[in-house]
């Protein structure tokens, strides 16, 4: 490669060739043709395209591209990236990982070289396991998100047997230090992959953890990692999902062994499987069933499965059994069932805790920006407020958004009148909340006399203006759940193009 080769790479062509490899791996894995899977994976790992994509991800696309590992190396120039591509191969080695503590959790930062190797492995492993993963696993998987899990729970709560089961029981569970305590031998045995990838994954799992790196006030020390998958690695979410894969299928088989719990005593095996819903997002999951006895026994069965497999335990503080009529929280939402006549309706709202977190975050931003201009304050608050609204707009959000809009307005009004005590209130109001203006947001025109606005001049003395949209301007929508067996690697471009268009439109509305 010449020094200009990086800029002249035809990335759409490279991506399309990688996609063809991954589609073939996915389909071979679906057919349980292990020999074919391994052959295609080997070709992919050795291809120049895969190495280019892996290096691009860790040096160009990733937000952590300028964050060094223990070798203090970053790859920013085209020449450095080209050299990394030439040298990239799975050698079964891994440098110690740098541990950074955010709040109470530790994030592990591998070197850029190890990140590139992880990205290379991910290209080969992910399509194989996407063909195997269970229908209702949604965390850290391509093409799936929190809203798919939300809708799956809603569908499960709405479905009932027609035998006066107007509520269900929910096991809302979490796993204690899931990613930090997964058994290495269990994970590697379950992975069952090519020798070069197996030895490389072992090296990453066993890589030492370097504490207090770049902290001159503390002594640097390296400790051995004897269990768990380091959080922060590109491949870590996939390894976590592999370790927990099988939980849903196990519980579906388990429920079939239980005696019939219906009045008719005619529950078939298929009906029993459908009666139990297991919906997982990473290390948090819910079990839903109409019989509390089944839920009580299911909790014990899950504890047994976790202990005898990945060597994990349920987090008793995060685990509870609830009645759906009382409501429960999951992924920031509150789910509750309401009986109306002969029908059961499932309602989803932003949880009270999620609302409190938003108000606290807005308050903290305002307090940190007491002397900032309105323009700068809006620049910080807008992505927070609009991002929160776009996440929760797929629930029953209208009244919640109205309440939060009022609370945020009170904070903003206090900030405005506190910073300017020399002028009259009408003058201050007109300066920060101009009257008679129209605003376009989400393709809709809004006219409001209490919208916080700000102005600034750029380097060319051009006046720039911004404003803070109200939460209520974000309209509620219905989320369309992903089809259970679909994957971005399945080759169904028409299906994924339609979903991508929906996401693009969502992003455009978010930016407006």
Feature names for model-found ranges:
Residues 206, 210-215, 309-374, 379, ...:
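A conserved non-catalytic segment of reverse transcriptases
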Residues 3-64, 123-139:
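Charged boundary/loop elements
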Residues 411, 416-512:
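Extended C-terminal regions of large enzymes
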Residues 38-48, 52-104:
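Phosphate/adenylate-binding "loop-and-lid" substructures adjacent to NTP/NAD/dNTP-binding pockets
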């Amino acid at each position: 490669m010449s020094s200009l080769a990086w800029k002249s790479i035809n990335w759409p062509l490279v991506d399309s060739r990688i996609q063809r490899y991954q589609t073939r791996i996915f389909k071979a894995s679906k057919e349980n043709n292990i020999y074919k899977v391994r052959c295609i994976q080997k070709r992919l790992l050795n291809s120049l395209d895969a190495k280019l994509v892996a290096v691009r991800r860790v040096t160009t696309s990733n937000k952590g591209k300028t964050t060094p590992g223990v070798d203090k190396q970053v790859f920013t120039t085209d020449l450095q990236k080209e050299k990394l591509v030439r040298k990239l191969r799975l050698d079964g080695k891994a440098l110690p990982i740098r541990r950074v503590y955010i709040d109470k959790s530790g994030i592990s930062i591998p070197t850029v070289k190890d990140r590139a190797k992880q990205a290379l492995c991910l290209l080969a492993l992910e399509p194989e396991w996407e063909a195997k993963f269970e229908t209702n696993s949604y965390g850290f998987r391509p093409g799936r998100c929190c809203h798919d899990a939300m809708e799956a729970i809603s569908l499960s709560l709405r479905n009932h047997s027609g035998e006066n089961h107007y509520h269900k029981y929910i096991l809302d569970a979490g796993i204690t230090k899931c990613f930090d305590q997964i058994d290495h031998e269990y994970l590697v045995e379950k992975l069952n992959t090519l020798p070069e990838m197996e030895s490389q994954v072992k090296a990453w799992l066993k890589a030492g953890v370097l504490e207090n790196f770049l902290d001159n006030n503390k002594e640097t020390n390296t400790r051995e990692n004897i269990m768990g998958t380091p959080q922060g690695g590109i491949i870590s979410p996939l390894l976590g999902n592999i370790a927990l894969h099988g939980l849903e299928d196990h519980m579906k088989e388990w429920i079939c062994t239980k005696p019939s719990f219906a009045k008719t005593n005619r529950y078939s095996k298929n009906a029993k499987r459908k009666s139990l819903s297991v919906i997982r997002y990473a290390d948090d999951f819910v079990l839903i069933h109409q019989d509390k006895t089944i839920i009580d026994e299911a909790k014990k069965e899950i504890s047994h499965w976790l202990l005898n497999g990945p060597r994990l335990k349920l987090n008793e503080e995060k685990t509870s059994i609830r009645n759906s009529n009382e409501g429960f929280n999951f992924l920031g939402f509150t789910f509750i069932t309401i009986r109306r006549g002969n029908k059961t309706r499932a309602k989803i709202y932003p949880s009270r805790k999620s609302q409190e977190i938003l108000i606290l975050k807005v308050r903290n931003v305002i307090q940190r920006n007491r002397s900032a201009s309105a323009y700068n304050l809006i620049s910080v608050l807008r992505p927070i407020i609009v991002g929160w609204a776009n996440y929760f707009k797929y629930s029953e959000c209208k009244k919640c958004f109205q309440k939060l809009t009022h609370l945020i307005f009170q904070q903003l009004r206090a900030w405005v009148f506190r910073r300017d005590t020399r002028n009259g209130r009408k003058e201050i109001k007109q300066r920060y909340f101009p009257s008679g203006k129209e605003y376009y947001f989400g393709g809709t025109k809004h006219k409001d006399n209490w919208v916080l606005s700000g102005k600034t001049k750029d380097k060319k003395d051009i006046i720039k203006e911004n404003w803070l949209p109200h939460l209520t301007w974000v309209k509620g929508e219905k989320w369309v759940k992903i089809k259970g067996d679909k994957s971005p690697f399945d080759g169904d471009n028409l299906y994924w193009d339609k979903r991508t268009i929906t996401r693009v439109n969502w992003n455009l509305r978010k930016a407006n």
